[in-house]
Swiss-Prot record:
Gene assigned in the entry: CFAP144P1
Primary site of residence: cytoplasm
Superkingdom field: Eukaryota
Record region (Disordered): 77-97
InterPro entries the record matches: CFAP144
Family: Belongs to the CFAP144 family.
Annotated localization: Cytoplasm, Cytoskeleton, Cilium basal body
Full protein name: Protein CFAP144P1
Presence of keyword Cytoplasm: yes
Keyword line: Cell projection, Cytoplasm, Cytoskeleton
One CC-aspect GO term: cytoskeleton
Organism per entry: Homo sapiens (Human)
Amino acid sequence: MAGHPKERVVTDEVHQNQILRELYLKELRTQKLHTQYHVNPLRKVHRITRKPMSWHDNLEEPADARFLNLIHHAAQGPTKKYPEAQTENQEIGWDSEALVDPERRDHRMNHFRVYSDITLYKAKMWSLGEDDRHK
């Protein structure tokens, strides 16, 4: 009620120390120390051009091996990056090597163009643009 004065709680230092200790341990459990930082891939990056006459911007920097490996890996084709197809479209043509070694001497499958004297003559006429009809 409004008319009654509140009872004053006697502060117990041991009890206060225990409460502070629990708060401190709770904060330590929820805190996380971030030591690795990276660029957010969902955020647009604004490029700032360097000053052309600045001496510290024109120093040669050593190549970062990890970055170069990432770039070279990204430039490879999917068959060199992955052991198997990653999508349905990649499955078509994933194994593009011939299953059977082609036998070039087998005339049942290989029909090579053979030239004789008359076919060479006619091919030369056609390449020069001459018409084979009589006038």
